[in-house]
């Protein structure tokens, strides 16, 4: 099939499949492969335009694949001011960002996709689609920035607000201006940028949309922002509970909340893994008539031939997961030091890809050296789950945020002890 053919399902995924391995990516790959009668388009949202290695071989029923960068390759702005009304643009952004206004979202979609002219006195010009630079590096963009800064965070550092605005609004307008594959249903695997793309596509293509959340996107982004050392709090509220001044960190959090509220309001179906997640979804506007639960599961027959290895030289604890901050691998390393005090010959295997966040991997290796755990902790890289499971006595999980981890279900097939810290 060609990219012009209509797919049955368009999967919209952010920062995940097929560039990143992990539980959600494996589930997505399985979901596509077990439905060979359906055709799938995949829109993989990435942070920037730099090429990435595809870690999964795309199934044969994938008819269209495209990567969508939030920050396209920078180009010199076109000559002439784009004929975008900065006041309308800024007010729409303010209402979308500050109040998750659905009408403002519609206005932004129109601005992103409506051909425009340019102010070129005495020179011929033609109407054309706006460039990404028109949305973040033009006179109308400057007007819109100032409207948002004054309304949303007047006390915050202006330079910090500028960069937050440029990053977040640039991402939003990339999503809203990107070409759309044709599909009967648009299925986002989170809220965030993926959720916005899915509900926009469904509206424009007169199709249906669904959102499936394993972890709750807004919670995970809030954790990322709280841990971020590139954000500096410049408004010191002390212990004041009712201080309503907003710092730039608050702007980031509010934008991600608005993404979710708009996506929930417009989606036809919202599914998640278990009931506790629905509490968070309801808090951001999801309705009971939209919501359902589909728990995680594994195919037990695939694990039937595995037998725990007996008489190993050392008792073995394993953590299976990506080496990224939200998995809190450093906490696993600290736990390994405690375990070694009780079981001196224990081996702790940290099993998973190390290339997603190289600086965090280096920090983890330094922590192993600091705690003198070189003979206890071993980073194995990615391994086949069926090969490693029989060697594990205990499965350890230290994630800050997890929904219903597949690795614990898989560990249960070997009757390995499972634990979370």
Residue ranges and their predicted role:
Residues 302-338, 349:
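Conserved donor-binding/catalytic core segment of Leloir-type glycosyltransferases
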Residues 347-366:
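Glycosyltransferase donor-sugar binding loop
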Residues 400:
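Aromatic "clamp/platform" in nucleotide-sugar-dependent glycosyltransferases that forms part
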Residues 241-246, 361-382:
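Nucleotide-activated donor-binding/catalytic signature segment of Leloir-type glycosyltransferases, i.e.
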Residues 276, 297:
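Carbohydrate-associated surface elements
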Residues 1-152:
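N-terminal subdomain of nucleotide-sugar transferases
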């Amino acid at each position: 099939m060609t990219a012009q053919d209509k797919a049955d399902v368009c999967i919209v995924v952010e920062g995940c499949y097929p560039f990143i391995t992990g539980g959600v990516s494996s589930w997505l790959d399985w979901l596509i492969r077990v439905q060979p009668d359906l055709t799938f388009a995949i829109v993989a949202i990435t942070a920037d335009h730099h090429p990435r290695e595809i870690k999964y071989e795309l199934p044969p029923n994938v008819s269209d694949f495209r990567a969508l960068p939030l920050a396209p390759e920078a180009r010199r702005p076109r000559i002439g001011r784009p004929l975008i009304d900065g006041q309308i643009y800024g007010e729409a952004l303010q209402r979308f960002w500050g109040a998750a206004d659905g009408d403002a979202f519609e206005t932004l979609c129109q601005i992103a996709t409506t051909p425009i002219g340019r102010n070129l006195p005495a020179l011929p010009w033609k109407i054309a689609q706006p460039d990404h630079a028109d949305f973040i590096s033009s006179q109308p963009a400057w007007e819109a920035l100032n409207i948002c800064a004054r309304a949303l965070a007047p006390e915050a550092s202006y330079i910090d607000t500028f960069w937050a605005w440029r990053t977040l609004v640039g991402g939003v307008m990339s999503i809203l201006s990107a070409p759309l594959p044709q599909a009967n249903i648009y299925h986002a695997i989170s809220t965030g940028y993926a959720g916005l793309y899915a509900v926009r596509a469904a509206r424009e293509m007169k199709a249906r949309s669904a959102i499936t959340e394993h972890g709750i996107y807004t919670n995970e982004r809030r954790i990322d922002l709280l841990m971020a050392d590139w954000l500096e709090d410049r408004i010191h509220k002390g212990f004041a509970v009712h201080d309503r001044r907003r710092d730039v960190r608050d702007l980031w959090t509010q934008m991600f909340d608005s993404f979710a509220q708009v996506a929930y309001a417009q989606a036809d179906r919202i599914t998640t893994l278990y009931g506790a997640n629905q509490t968070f979804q309801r808090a951001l506007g999801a309705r009971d008539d939209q919501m359902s639960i589909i728990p995680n599961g594994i195919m037990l027959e695939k694990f039937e031939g595995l037998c725990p290895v007996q008489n190993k030289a050392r008792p073995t604890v394993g953590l299976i997961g990506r080496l990224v901050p939200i998995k809190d691998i450093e906490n696993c390393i600290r736990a390994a030091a405690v375990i070694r005090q009780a079981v001196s010959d224990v081996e702790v295997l940290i099993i998973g890809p190390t290339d997603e966040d190289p600086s965090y991997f280096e920090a983890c290796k330094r922590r192993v050296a600091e705690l003198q755990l070189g003979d206890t902790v071993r980073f194995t890289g990615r391994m086949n789950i069926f090969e490693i499971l029989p060697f594990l006595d205990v499965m350890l999980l230290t994630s800050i945020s997890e929904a219903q981890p597949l690795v614990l279900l898989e560990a249960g097939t070997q009757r390995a002890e499972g634990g979370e810290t």
